[in-house]
């Protein structure tokens, strides 16, 4: 049986990855991490979506230790989310080590259930703010997991080379545009759906959606072209 584990936050990107995986794999597991994130609603949204979409299993894992180690506006209520980059060149919403931890734990979970594919929604679009969303980071993590567990394992990143408009196109391609738009939580201020419209995450989401809706045919064609190139 072809199994996959999706790292799932209940946001736009991971939900798009999840609906795509459900169309491609025999058995799909979702894993969500409780790291003391700013908005507890994120976990509830993920649980509701996992149930609605009918995943084989949804694991919510307690990793609140990360909250103690990683100081970020996403883990501390007293740190306002800022659009500005800090002195280190990163936004204060960056949680150091988050994707290292998440992919490691997802790899362990995949090992236990006999899955050889992990799917995560990271993409180079986010590289300006998040170094652990880079393609070379994911490849390094993939190599480390394979060597460390002596097991064939592939980390898939369906969004890696897509812009936000193409990510919306991917949701539409999998008949989930409205679900992703209305039921996911991407907003740093904890508002489901279209969000607050002001935080960096909402801004990126809104610009991408408007671009897709205004240029649907061209952007879908661009997505399909990238998919064909990736499959060669």
UniProtKB/Swiss-Prot annotation:
Coiled coil stretches, renumbered: none
Gene3D superfamilies in UniProt: HUPs
EC number annotated for this UniProt entry: 6.3.4.20
Catalytic activity: 7-carboxy-7-deazaguanine + NH4(+) + ATP = 7-cyano-7-deazaguanine + ADP + phosphate + H2O + H(+)
UniProt: Zn(2+) binding residues: 187, 196, 199, 202
Gene Ontology terms describing biological process: queuosine biosynthetic process
InterPro entries: QueC, Rossmann-like_a/b/a_fold
Broadest EC class assigned to this enzyme: ligase
GO terms, molecular function: ATP binding; ligase activity, forming carbon-nitrogen bonds; zinc ion binding
Keywords, in A-Z order: ATP-binding, Ligase, Metal-binding, Nucleotide-binding, Queuosine biosynthesis, Zinc
Manner of cofactor binding, per the entry note: Binds 1 zinc ion per subunit.
Similarity comment: family membership: Belongs to the QueC family.
PANTHER family recorded: 7-CYANO-7-DEAZAGUANINE SYNTHASE
Functional note: Catalyzes the ATP-dependent conversion of 7-carboxy-7-deazaguanine (CDG) to 7-cyano-7-deazaguanine (preQ(0)).
Entry protein name: 7-cyano-7-deazaguanine synthase
Organism: Vibrio vulnificus (strain YJ016)
Gene giving rise to this polypeptide: queC
């Amino acid at each position: 049986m072809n199994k996959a584990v999706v790292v799932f936050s209940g946001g736009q990107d991971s939900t798009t990855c999840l609906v795509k995986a459900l169309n491609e794999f025999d058995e799909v597991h979702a894993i969500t991490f409780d790291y003391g994130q700013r908005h507890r609603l994120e976990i509830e949204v993920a649980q509701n979506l996992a149930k609605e979409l009918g995943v084989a299993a949804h694991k919510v894992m307690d990793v609140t230790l990360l909250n103690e180690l990683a100081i970020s506006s996403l883990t501390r209520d007293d740190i306002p989310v800022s659009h500005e980059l800090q002195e280190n060149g990163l936004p204060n919403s960056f949680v150091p080590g988050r994707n290292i931890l998440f992919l490691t734990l997802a790899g362990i979970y995949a090992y236990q259930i006999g899955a050889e594919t992990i799917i995560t929604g990271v993409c180079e679009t986010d590289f300006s703010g998040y170094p652990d969303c880079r393609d070379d980071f994911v490849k390094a993590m993939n190599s480390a997991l394979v060597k460390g567990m002596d097991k064939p394992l592939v980390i898939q990143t369906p969004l890696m080379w897509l812009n936000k408009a193409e990510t919306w196109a991917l949701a539409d391609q999998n008949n989930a545009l409205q679900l992703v738009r209305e039921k996911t939580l991407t907003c740093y201020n904890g508002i489901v759906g279209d969000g607050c419209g002001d935080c960096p995450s909402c801004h990126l989401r809104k610009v991408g959606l408007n671009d897709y809706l205004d240029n649907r045919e061209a952007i879908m064609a661009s997505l399909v072209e990238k998919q064909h190139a990736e499959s060669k």
